[in-house]
A protein has these predicted regions:
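The feature marks the mature, well-folded catalytic cores of soluble enzymes
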Residues: 1-308
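Conserved small/polar residues in nucleotide/adenosyl-binding loops
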Residues: 313
Length: 313
């Protein structure tokens, strides 16, 4: 299933984007901040390029042995109580996820930021079946409210500034506050908290799946991913086939690179390693975990010159 945000011809969209000076300024400012922070942190690491080379070798090793590691990950995830589903295509993934919603009788869910769900067009698909997905990442909530597509893989609302966000929430959500980011965040927290508490299903992505433990990891700066994966009774993890690392030691290497490279920080605000369903005596966590592993052309790429895409994704 493809996802369409704008029916206008490509040429019209290009001219519209090139003439939008507001978005140009917003994107340039945000990119300058992120790039500056990243460069400063990278300069503190003497062996940064060695780290990158080591991480690339880990990713290459996994891709060369992908069948083995996917099987190991799935086996260990099942031992932890999770149900693992394999989806060859985006439509297979959507049908699988819909089956889970229907089995649970669920008509809504909370979501954490996930480019995998963006790739398969999950929100549009769920809405077409009468299911309400609620984005809980601040930036994702902004673009969902605006009906926009993400403008950046890490910072999806890069094309908004604080004033446009304030005006958007005033028009769409009745927000009466200022354009102060902290005040807007407090409004979002108050708005989203009931959604977390009442949602029957939480949908998340997966930064890395750990083969030796069957764990799914989540990185966020707002804590929303942890809430989406711990409060609802059912969690659906949607991940690409290539998102596997062999073990926790390899995960450590990838994490040291990920946050520095993505947002110019030493560590994220929240990092979770989720291993299966809630166990007896535990106060939170989902009773049911479904892991949907999506191929959608990823293994086809391994045989071609574009193979490095799988390593870097």
């Amino acid at each position: 299933m493809s996802i369409i945000y704008d029916d206008a011809p490509l040429e019209d969209r290009i001219h519209r984007a090139l003439s939008d000076t507001f978005k140009h300024r917003a994107i340039e400012t945000a990119q300058d901040v992120i790039t500056g922070k990243r460069d400063a942190l990278v300069a503190e690491v003497d062996n940064w390029e060695d780290f990158r080379t080591h991480a690339a070798s880990i990713r290459d090793h996994v891709l060369e042995n992908l069948d083995y590691y996917v099987r190991q990950f799935a086996t260990n995830a099942q031992k932890n109580g999770a149900q693992v589903h394999f989806a060859p295509t985006d439509n297979d993934a959507l049908d699988c996820i819909l089956d889970i919603f229907e089995a649970e009788g669920a008509k809504s869910c909370v979501k954490s930021k996930s480019m995998m769900t963006e790739e398969i067009g999950l929100n549009t698909f769920l809405e077409s079946h009468g299911i309400k997905p609620v984005e809980t990442d601040c930036a994702e909530h902004i673009i969902q409210t605006a009906g926009n597509a993400p403008s950046h893989i890490v910072v999806p609302a890069l094309h908004f500034d604080r004033t446009s966000i304030r005006n958007l929430y005033h028009e769409q959500k009745g927000y009466e506050g200022t354009n102060d980011p902290e005040e807007i965040t407090r409004f979002l927290r108050k708005t989203l908290r009931p959604e977390f508490m009442n949602a029957p299903i939480g949908v998340t992505g997966c930064n890395f799946g750990v083969a030796e433990t069957g764990s799914c990891t989540l990185v966020s700066n707002e804590g929303n991913a942890r809430m989406a994966s711990s409060i609802p009774e059912t969690q659906i993890v949607v991940m690409g086939t290539e998102r596997i690392v062999p073990d926790l030691r390899s995960l450590d290497v990838m994490m040291k690179l990920l946050v520095r490279s993505a947002v110019g920080a030493k560590i994220s605000g929240s990092f979770s390693i989720n291993t299966g369903c809630r166990r007896e005596g535990e106060a939170d966590g989902p009773k049911n975990v479904h892991i949907v592993i999506v191929n959608n052309g990823r293994t086809d790429i391994l045989a071609h010159e574009f193979r490095p895409i799988d390593r870097k994704s």
